């Protein structure tokens, strides 16, 4: 890639700045961390690796990066693409081979949703590998739009107010997941991916119900954004400004013992004595 234009330079700086802010705000990376960067071959994970490699050079702390791709043995997966790219970058990398594709095909009847099992198998394999190599953080490439979409998916289809946190300790307690692109917009990531000409591996969408639902939510948000620019950003800010007393979750707020404060001063004016 040659010299960047003014707009291209702004794009690169914006992504680096937003990722840096997210890392700092949530203390995602600390001195001496070994960050396992999970690569799928898509625009998001390539951009995340690029940004983290820059951050590694300029950050006031020292941390290591290890790139990891999981080859799930899906038919047609181009096994040579990522190793060639990572060798050219000159960074440490691992290709974890695990035939989860055959397991899913064997256990899930044709036409049924495979996402849940596929995701669990992939996550479990990556968690185990992170433990094996001594990784202290596991970086995923989810961005702001992914987080907002997940919020609506959970609300519409699961009846819960839940999204993707920028930083998460896994249920096993041994893995901490970070999402450095949490503040970054998908359109910026797409533009940067096009600019850098990353060797994209096409996503083999299975057409499952979960993917179809996510696409519906994505289109809904895009339509909102066209009609009211800035709405997605406002929704994302709302996820950082939660007020449990204004919701209805009894586990988050003690409504049962909520009573008047007898010591509180009256806020009403005695109009009779005016």
From Swiss-Prot:
GO MF term list: 4 iron, 4 sulfur cluster binding; ATP binding; magnesium ion binding; sulfurtransferase activity; tRNA binding
Task: List positions binding [4Fe-4S] cluster.
Answer: 115, 118, 206
Gene3D superfamilies per the record? HUPs
Q: How is the cofactor bound?
A: Binds 1 [4Fe-4S] cluster per subunit. The cluster is chelated by three Cys residues, the fourth Fe has a free coordination site that may bind a sulfur atom transferred from the persulfide of IscS.
Mark the transmembrane ranges.
none
Q: Which GO terms describe its cellular component?
A: cytoplasm
Kindly tell me the pathway this chain contributes to.
Answer: tRNA modification
Q: Which positions does the motif PP-loop motif occupy?
A: 40-45
Which reaction is recorded as catalysed by this protein? Answer: cytidine(32) in tRNA + S-sulfanyl-L-cysteinyl-[cysteine desulfurase] + AH2 + ATP = 2-thiocytidine(32) in tRNA + L-cysteinyl-[cysteine desulfurase] + A + AMP + diphosphate + H(+)
Localization, per the record, is:
Cytoplasm
This protein's major location comes to cytoplasm
Q: Does the keyword Transferase apply?
A: yes
**Per the UniProt record, which EC number(s) apply here?**
2.8.1.-
SUPFAM superfamilies with a match to the protein in the record? Adenine nucleotide alpha hydrolases-like
Keywords per UniProt: 4Fe-4S, ATP-binding, Cytoplasm, Iron, Iron-sulfur, Magnesium, Metal-binding, Nucleotide-binding, RNA-binding, Transferase, tRNA processing, tRNA-binding
Q: Which cofactors does this gene product need?
A: Mg(2+); [4Fe-4S] cluster
Q: What Pfam families would the database entry show? A: ATP_bind_3 (PF01171)
Tell me which Gene Ontology terms the entry assigns under biological process.
Answer: tRNA thio-modification
* InterPro entries per UniProt: Rossmann-like_a/b/a_fold, TilS/TtcA_N, tRNA_Cyd_32_2_STrfase, tRNA_thiolation_TtcA_Ctu1
Q: Which family does it belong to?
A: Belongs to the TtcA family.
Please give the subunit comment from the record.
Homodimer.
- What else is on record for this protein? The thiolation reaction likely consists of two steps: a first activation step by ATP to form an adenylated intermediate of the target base of tRNA, and a second nucleophilic substitution step of the sulfur (S) atom supplied by the hydrosulfide attached to the Fe-S cluster.
Question: What this chain does, per the record?
Answer: Catalyzes the ATP-dependent 2-thiolation of cytidine in position 32 of tRNA, to form 2-thiocytidine (s(2)C32). The sulfur atoms are provided by the cysteine/cysteine desulfurase (IscS) system.
Protein name, entry field: tRNA-cytidine(32) 2-sulfurtransferase
Native species = Pseudomonas syringae pv. syringae (strain B728a)
